[in-house]
């Protein structure tokens, strides 16, 4: 099943989806409830064993979903997995949002494989082996639905940014693991909803780091 959550958009998004993809379940929110709120609302209507949270500004390689499903099927101790995420405008480089999996430094600040601050690494196969990570990118992450519900989903205090870090952290407190599965591949535009280097994006990033 495919569920599209519309966070109070004012363009023709909902109309276009209805016209082009009649099989898609559309949930329309009157207001923008943020990434966390939107995902939680969508998850409440989902029936699957696994939940795939996916940004709307992505393109995908063939079979990538099956590869994530197969990994979760064969790793029952894993809560969440993410694909390799490359930049859609320059497909030889990792994407800003998640690259090949995230970690926290000794001060609690996040970083990812594939990016050093704002500098993106070229993908030369250096992260092509599946590996355990601390957090999976919210741009594309597949999770176990029962554990997601047990964790009460995303914490909606995080309107945008770092909600996936909090979720993965809480899952690990229950002894579940988080993995990067790089043979599953997607491409991400990035910063299409909240533009980079705006006051709002800086505020949310820094506030959420401290939360």
Could you say what each language-model-derived stretch is?
Residues 51:
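Short aromatic/hydrophobic "clamp" motif used to bind/position activated sugar donors
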Residues 128, 132-185:
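A short, conserved alpha-helix in the catalytic core of glycosyltransferases
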Residues 59-98, 102-109:
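Conserved donor NDP-sugar-binding/catalytic core segment of glycosyltransferases
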Residues 28-46, 56, 67:
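Glycine-rich, basic loop-to-helix element that forms the pyrophosphate-binding segment
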Residues 101-133:
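Short, flexible, basic/aromatic active-site loop/helix in glycosyltransferases
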Residues 14-15, 40, 48, 62-73, ...:
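Short alpha-helix within the catalytic core of nucleotide-sugar-dependent glycosyltransferases
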Residues 173-211:
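Active-site-adjacent helix/loop segment of glycosyltransferases
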Residues 1-31:
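Acidic donor-binding segment of Leloir-type glycosyltransferases
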């Amino acid at each position: 099943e495919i569920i599209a959550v519309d966070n109070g958009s004012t363009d023709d998004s909902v109309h276009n989806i209805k016209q082009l993809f009649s099989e898609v379940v559309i949930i329309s929110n009157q207001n923008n409830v943020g990434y966390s709120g939107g995902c939680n609302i969508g998850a409440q209507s989902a029936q699957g064993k696994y939940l795939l949270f996916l940004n709307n500004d992505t393109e995908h390689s063939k079979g990538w979903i099956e590869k994530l499903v197969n990994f979760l099927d064969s790793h029952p101790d894993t809560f969440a997995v993410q694909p390799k995420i490359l930049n859609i405008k320059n497909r030889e480089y990792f994407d800003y949002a998640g690259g090949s999996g995230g970690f926290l430094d000794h001060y609690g600040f996040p970083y990812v494989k594939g990016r050093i601050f704002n500098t993106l690494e070229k993908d030369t196969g250096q992260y092509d082996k599946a590996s355990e990570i601390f957090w999976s990118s919210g741009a594309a992450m597949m999770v176990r639905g029962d554990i997601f519900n047990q964790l009460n989903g995303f914490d909606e205090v995080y309107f945008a940014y770092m909600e996936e870090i909090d979720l993965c952290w809480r899952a690990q407190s229950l002894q579940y693991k988080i993995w990067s599965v790089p043979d599953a591949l997607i491409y991400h535009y990035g910063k299409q909803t909240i533009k980079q280097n705006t006051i709002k994006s800086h505020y949310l990033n820094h506030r959420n780091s401290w939360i």
